């Protein structure tokens, strides 16, 4: 996904992990990605920029359509992050400047490492199920890896573990000794939880991580409180398990990680450390520098960068 605000501010993001278990609700805001494709942006927002290394979370759908392609995000650049694409329903087609063209379906993972620079697009493919529902998330890369060579990996199957009435698919990182095959560069976790039947579930957690959950489908209760759609629930640190009551068919996303120990600066689709790095990346994109390459398989124009005013970064 892309941040299409006409004049985005640079956001300064630092770890701000609660020192104990907590429950704080953050309502996602609407963001229009063009062509009427509206997402709910749960990260970053006022009061909560990071959950571990997770710095961005867009939730789109569920929607049904009869013609056309509701998702058509033209080529745009990234630096300093990994993108995680996860679908609940439907299909999406990834194309990038490394030459990859990859269809993704529910239960599969697209993981793109931007490193020093990459460009990609995301579209509804011509042959599709006329439905779309999913997430795109970003992981901030730590300083030692943020300027590495870009790469893309598709994982067609992922490991699963069962807790009570709930199936947990390990998308990113490790849960209860079960590890995703996806390569990441920080201590982190991303898991989709799905209930086969009504009941209570206790999911083991790493107490040193901070965590958050987002309802995707159905009815889920945390501490006898029903989770609201379109709301990110931040859970703090120090939890050894997550106790939930779910109705059959419910699904939610759990994300977390060690509090990210580096200050980052986010602007448009870039995760950097200084305003000068952002200005250089923007200039390279606008001048068609080989740093980002071309998404040759995409038919249409790429996204222009918004204007950049190097105001002092807006703290969290």
Q: Where are the language model's segments positioned?
A:
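Jelly-roll (double-stranded beta-helix
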Residues: 1-316
């Amino acid at each position: 996904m892309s941040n299409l605000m006409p004049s985005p501010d640079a956001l300064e993001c630092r770890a701000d992990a609660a020192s104990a278990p907590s429950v704080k609700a953050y309502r996602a805001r609407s963001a229009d990605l063009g062509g009427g494709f509206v997402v709910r942006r749960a990260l970053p927002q006022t009061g909560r920029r990071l959950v571990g290394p997770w710095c961005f979370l867009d939730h789109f759908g569920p929607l049904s359509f009869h013609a056309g392609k509701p998702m058509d995000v033209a080529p745009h650049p990234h630096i300093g992050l990994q993108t995680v694409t996860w679908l609940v329903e439907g299909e999406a087609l990834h194309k990038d400047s490394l030459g990859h063209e990859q269809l993704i379906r529910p239960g599969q993972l697209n993981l793109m490492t931007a490193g020093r620079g990459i460009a990609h697009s995301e579209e509804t493919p011509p042959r599709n199920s006329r439905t779309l529902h999913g997430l795109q998330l970003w992981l901030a890369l730590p300083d030692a890896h943020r300027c590495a060579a870009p790469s893309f990996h598709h994982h067609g199957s992922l490991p699963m573990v069962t807790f009570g009435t709930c199936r947990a698919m390990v998308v990113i990182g490790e849960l209860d000794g079960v590890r995703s095959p996806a390569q990441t560069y920080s201590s982190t976790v991303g898991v989709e939880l799905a209930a086969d039947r009504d009941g209570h579930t206790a999911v083991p957690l790493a107490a040193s991580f901070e965590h958050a959950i987002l309802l995707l489908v159905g009815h889920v209760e945390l501490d006898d409180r029903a989770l609201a759609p379109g709301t990110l629930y931040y859970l703090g640190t120090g939890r050894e398990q997550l106790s939930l009551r779910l109705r059959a068919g419910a699904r939610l996303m759990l994300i977390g990680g060690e509090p990210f120990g580096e200050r980052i600066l986010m602007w448009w689709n870039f995760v950097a450390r200084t305003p000068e790095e952002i200005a250089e990346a923007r200039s390279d994109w606008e001048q068609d520098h080989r740093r980002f390459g071309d998404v040759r398989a995409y038919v249409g124009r790429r996204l222009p960068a918004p204007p950049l005013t190097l105001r002092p970064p807006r703290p969290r």
